[in-house]
Amino acid sequence: LLGLFGKRKATLVLGLDISSTTVKLLELSYTGGRYRVESYAVSSLPQDAVIEKSVNDVEGVSNAIRTVVAQSRTKLKNVAAAVAGSSVITKLIDMPQGLSEDDMEIQLTLEADQYIPYPLEEVAIDFEVQGPAPDRDNQVEVLLAACRRETIESRVEAIEGSELVPKIMDVEAYAMERAFSLVRNQLDLDEESTVAIVDIGATMTTLSVLSDGQTIYTREQLFGGKQLTDEIMRRYGLPLEEAGLAKKQGGLPDDYEPEVLEPFKEAVVQQVARSLQFFFSSSQYNDVDHIILAGGVSSMEGLEELVREKLGTPTSVANPFAQMSISSSVNAVALGSDAPAMMIACGLALRSFD
């Protein structure tokens, strides 16, 4: 079985988030009722090493993982990584109460082809008991998750190639839920609040809507910070690396803000609004209580206010580390600016304390 949920006694694991343009690594500890950031690092990936969430260049990804391990100076070897929700099929199934894990595994393996549209030899499956089945006596509700082996294997290969040990392969949506539980405490949101997390990465934007802390809707679309970088390259004739730096550090001509940056921010707001419309039209909801912006783009100055003002919904930028202590060896300023992009890495590192 896959270990998507990692049914084993908790060991300390590094959270390793492999996105389309970067590898992010995070190590947490927990003492005296408080989490502490022990080490972290972010490294960029070679172009096209990961395409739309699939590892395309195993060696390129391995090298980037080696870089973050060296930068972070972590001593840990065990890793929790994740696959994108779009590559995982999940189904809730009822099963007889009182079955042992082994019996469940046998029965699910026999019945899995009813639920999964791929040949069974091509998929890895895992399951987790959710609790008693509502309205059905002597039955439990079981979450079955299946993912194509090649999706997992390319990630496993990249991790092993960097001399780390892949202990847990999670799903990004579940990692996001775990990190959200930290953010929710800071925002004083009710348990039952409906919250939209908009994770804007370099090439992908993922909307996750959570109610009662559980994901009830996700949607991925191709849109991200790379569009801004591409526009800087096109307009000012800069190579990729310089454009990326200028975007972060400034030094672009005066027309950059009004002509490039502001229209990009407006485009972000439109993407958020459109994603939410898709959610509203496919559910009985017609509003959300709070919007949380995550991902590298979200810390862009003024974006939080713009989303709040245009959509009329309380909005904040994710910082999973706000209530954590930080080791003296960690650059707290850098961590603060990377924080919104570290949600998935954080949710994965939290697997240490299952």
Q: Positions of the model-derived regions?
A:
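Gly/Thr-rich phosphate-binding beta-strand-loop-beta motif of the actin/hexokinase/Hsp70
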Residues: 2-44, 77-82, 186-217, 224-227, ...
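N-terminal phosphate-binding loop and adjacent alpha-helix
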Residues: 39-70, 255-260, 264, 332-336
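Glycine-rich phosphate-binding loop plus the immediately following alpha-helix
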Residues: 50, 150-178, 214-254
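Active-site neighborhood for divalent-cation/phosphate handling
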Residues: 82-184, 290, 320-326, 341-344, ...
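Adenine-nucleotide phosphate-binding core of ATP-dependent small-molecule kinases
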Residues: 230, 234-235, 242-290, 297
